[in-house]
Amino acid sequence: MESVLNNEKAIVVFSGGQDSTTCLFYAKKHFKEVELVTFNYGQRHDTEIEVAKQIAQDQGMKHHVLDMSLLSQLTPNALTQHDMEITNNEDGIPNTFVPARNLLFLSFAGALAYQIGAKHIITGVCETDFSGYPDCRDSFIKSMNVTLSLAMDKDFVIHTPLMWLNKAETWKLSDELEVLDYIRTKTLTCYNGIIGDGCGECPACHLRQRGLNQYLESKGAL
């Protein structure tokens, strides 16, 4: 299967974070041609867009940045509101959840894939370290794959290489791709906008660091 994929084109939904950057290198390994798409939806930190641009430049990859600022107008959430504290809502879903974000992102990624002739769409969503985001579920992705293909009469394939990996396993994958140190130092996962190991205090940093420690312990590197 890999040899077939190597002759095809893919687009990666790319934020400059650990997961999507791991997907970038996964795509580079498995596809002949890869482009990136980043969505500017009014994130708390402009740094996220700049990090994505820098990584794309480092890797010499064509990078599309699309304006999705409408998202921040639809609903208040801690990913777009600078003065909102990050907490869990009554239903257990963190207030970092942006309703319909992945629905819209994959729709626009599909439209772009159609225009550039890419059959494959790669996204870093994951159920294993599940924050409660309903649009990260495997069932949603499978449904979206069918919807995009029907909507544009194209046989798209949405790939989720991290879907069943926990954070330690995601670090393992990056190590197998020989980019662990690059991802550790160059990506932005921190909700407080600090590149690399981050602030060490926010939920995203805790999850990332715990996974890294677990992986390094498993290989005897700590």
Swiss-Prot record:
BP-aspect Gene Ontology terms: queuosine biosynthetic process
Top-level taxon of origin: Bacteria
UniProt binding sites for Zn(2+): C190, C199, C202, C205
Record keywords, A-Z: ATP-binding, Ligase, Metal-binding, Nucleotide-binding, Queuosine biosynthesis, Zinc
Known EC number: 6.3.4.20
Enzyme class: ligase
A GO MF term: zinc ion binding
Textual note on the cofactor: Binds 1 zinc ion per subunit.
Positions of ATP binding: F14, S15, G16, G17, Q18, D19, S20, T21, T22, C23, L24
A Pfam family it matches: QueC
Main function: Catalyzes the ATP-dependent conversion of 7-carboxy-7-deazaguanine (CDG) to 7-cyano-7-deazaguanine (preQ(0)).
Subunit comment: Homodimer.
Protein name: 7-cyano-7-deazaguanine synthase
Source organism of this protein record: Staphylococcus aureus (strain NCTC 8325 / PS 47)
Gene: queC
